[in-house]
Structures are given as C-alpha cells and as structure tokens.
C-alpha cells in the first residue's frame, strides 16, 4: 500500500483518527500562536499591533481555530475514531469512506479561515459573527464571506461525522452488547454526535442568511427591510450553547475512564446516573440558549424561564462531579505519571 493510498484514501478508523490528531495538534499550535499575539498586545500599556481591527481579527481567528480545528478534531475525530469502534468491538466505523471525507473537509475549511484574515481587513467580528457588524457595510470585502464558507465546510464535516458516530454506536455493537453496557466514553461521543446533528443545521441556516444579507440584498437581519439582528442571535445561540456542551461532553467521558483507572477501580461509581446525567445535560443544553442574550432585552417571564432552566443544568452536572469523587473514594489511587 502506497503512502498516498494509506493516508489520502483511508477507510481505516485508526489511520483517520491519527490524521485528526495530527491535524488537531498542528491547528493547536496555530491557535496558540494567535493567543500569544493577544497576550503580547495586552501584556503592556500602549499598542503592539496598532489597530483594533487586526486585534479583533486575531481574537476571532483564535476562537475558531481552537474550537473547530483543535478541540473538536482531537476529542471527537481523534479519540472518537480511535476508541469508539474498539470499545464496542466493531471492526471499523459504520461508514468508513464518509469518515475519510469528514476529515478531508477540514483542511480546506482551515485554509478558508486563514484566507479570511489575509484578504481585505479580515473578519474582526468575534466568533459570534453578529450582524450588523458582520454585514457588508461594517465589514465590506470578502473576509466575512470566507469565514462563513469555512464554517459551512467545518459544519458539513461535523454533521457527517455525527451521523457516522450515531450509527456506529447504536448499530455496530455485537448482538450481546446492550446500549447500557457500552463504556461511558462511547455514551459521551454518542450524545455529542446527537447534539451536533441537531444544532449545526441551525447555525448553517443562520450564517447562510447572513451570507445572502451580505451579497444578495436580502434583509433577514436588517431592520430597514423588516428583518431583525436579534433573529441571528437566536439562531446562533441555539447552536452556540449546545456547542459548548459538544466541547465538554467527550471530556466528561475521558475523565470518567481516567478517574476509574487511576482510582484502581474496575468500574465508575453510578454508571446509570452518569449516562442519564449526560443525556440530561445534552437535552437541557438546547433549551437555555437565550441566557447568552439577556443584554438585548427580554420579557420578564422569558428571563425567568431561561434563568431557571439554566440553573437546572447544575443538577446533572453535580451528579457527575459527585460520582467522580465517589469513584475516587476508597480507591487505591495510582500516583504514577
């Protein structure tokens, strides 16, 4: 098998997982370089970069690189691809060629994001890309359009990956293995994939409407034509809040395995509680998004609902922390590195 065949046309979950890990490590260095620019600018009085726009471009790029090209490829693409098939005893992922496509959509997406910062004035919108700042007046030129296309590609990659993980985790188990016997990391990736599948299409709709507002004279987010910038915020945060749970849920799964192993236990404390806590967090994550929008003004009853729904997420989260501590309790903790 030639180098090209193995690494470019791979249908092997381990090779694709390795590609994700290498890509994520490289993107992580780019993201770290961007954060060093931010710290250098903020580390002393006066200016270093000299311009607010370039600073905002660096902050925006840092966020996108770290979220979409470091954390998600490593935790879902890397660890997910490597571990999910092994943990359920499957020969590979359910759709190996789609798995390869999910990976190879990421480098072009990354290229588009980097391109957005090198043309015109860059996309200095923040990772939320709110209009009217992201509109074609405040951000004339191709920068924001390139950033939107980058998000489109990364989104398609994640949706395909999510379909693959959901199908694999549910359908590729041996007949004797029930869903309640799969390891917690498998559960965490499954729930993460469901969140991706349900939230990303909404982001895609929002940024596509922004794209047409910028280029095709629509007014989805322009009050002059009967639109409303707050609509964009609802669409974005309906994705954006589940996204932060997408970033942490695989970490929950990893922590459960790490804590169990280093406590010298054969299983985590409260397996079913852990599973249902993750399911609850995933579900509740979809009905709390407007707490990111309190400053735009909201009806008192709406504020009361979103506040209390948000606080309820603390309960399953507390169950998880309690169970990790209970797993450690009474164990022979291994202190080796």
Swiss-Prot record:
Coiled coil: none
Highest taxon above the source species: Eukaryota
GO annotation (BP), single: electron transport coupled proton transport
Enzyme class: translocase
Cellular component GO terms held in the UniProt record: mitochondrial inner membrane; respiratory chain complex IV
Catalytic activity: 4 Fe(II)-[cytochrome c] + O2 + 8 H(+)(in) = 4 Fe(III)-[cytochrome c] + 2 H2O + 4 H(+)(out)
Example GO molecular function: metal ion binding
Enzyme Commission number, as recorded: 7.1.1.9
Binding of Fe(II)-heme a, residues: 62
Chain sites annotated for binding Cu cation: 241, 291-292
Places the protein is found: Mitochondrion inner membrane
PANTHER family hit by this protein: CYTOCHROME C OXIDASE SUBUNIT 1
Protein name, as recorded: Cytochrome c oxidase subunit 1
UniProt source species: Dromaius novaehollandiae (Emu)
Organism ancestry: Eukaryota, Metazoa, Chordata, Craniata, Vertebrata
């Amino acid at each position: 098998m030639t180098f090209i065949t193995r690494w470019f046309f791979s249908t092997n979950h381990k090779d694709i997982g390795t590609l994700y890990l290498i890509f994520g490590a490289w993107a992580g260095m780019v993201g770290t370089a961007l954060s060093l620019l931010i710290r250098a600018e903020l580390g002393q009085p006066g200016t270093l970069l000299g311009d607010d726009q370039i600073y905002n471009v660096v902050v925006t790029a840092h966020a996108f690189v770290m979220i979409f090209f470091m954390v998600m490829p490593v935790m879902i693409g890397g660890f997910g691809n490597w571990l999910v098939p092994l943990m359920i005893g499957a020969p590979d992922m359910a759709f190996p060629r789609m798995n390869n496509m999910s990976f190879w959509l990421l480098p072009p997406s990354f290229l588009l994001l980097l391109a957005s910062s090198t043309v015109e004035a860059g996309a200095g919108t923040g990772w939320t890309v709110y209009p009217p700042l992201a509109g074609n007046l405040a951000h004339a030129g191709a920068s924001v359009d390139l950033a939107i296309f980058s998000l489109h590609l990364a989104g398609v990659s994640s949706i395909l990956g999510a379909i693959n993980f959901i199908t694999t985790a549910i359908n590729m188990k041996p007949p004797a293995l029930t869903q309640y016997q799969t390891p917690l990391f498998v559960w965490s990736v499954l729930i993460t994939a469901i969140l991706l599948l349900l939230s990303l299409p909404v982001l895609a709709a929002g940024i596509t409407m922004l794209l047409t507002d910028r280029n095709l004279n629509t007014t989805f987010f322009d009050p002059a034509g009967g639109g409303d910038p707050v609509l964009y915020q609802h669409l974005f945060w309906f994705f954006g809040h589940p996204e932060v749970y997408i970033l942490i849920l695989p970490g929950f799964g990893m922590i459960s395995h790490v804590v169990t192993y280093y406590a010298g236990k054969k299983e985590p404390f409260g397996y079913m509680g852990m599973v249902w806590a993750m399911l609850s967090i995933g579900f509740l994550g979809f009905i709390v998004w407007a707490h990111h929008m309190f400053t735009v003004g909201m009806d008192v009853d709406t504020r009361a609902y979103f506040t209390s729904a948000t606080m309820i997420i603390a309960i399953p989260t507390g169950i998880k922390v309690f169970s990790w501590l209970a797993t450690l309790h009474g164990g022979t903790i291994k202190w080796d590195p």
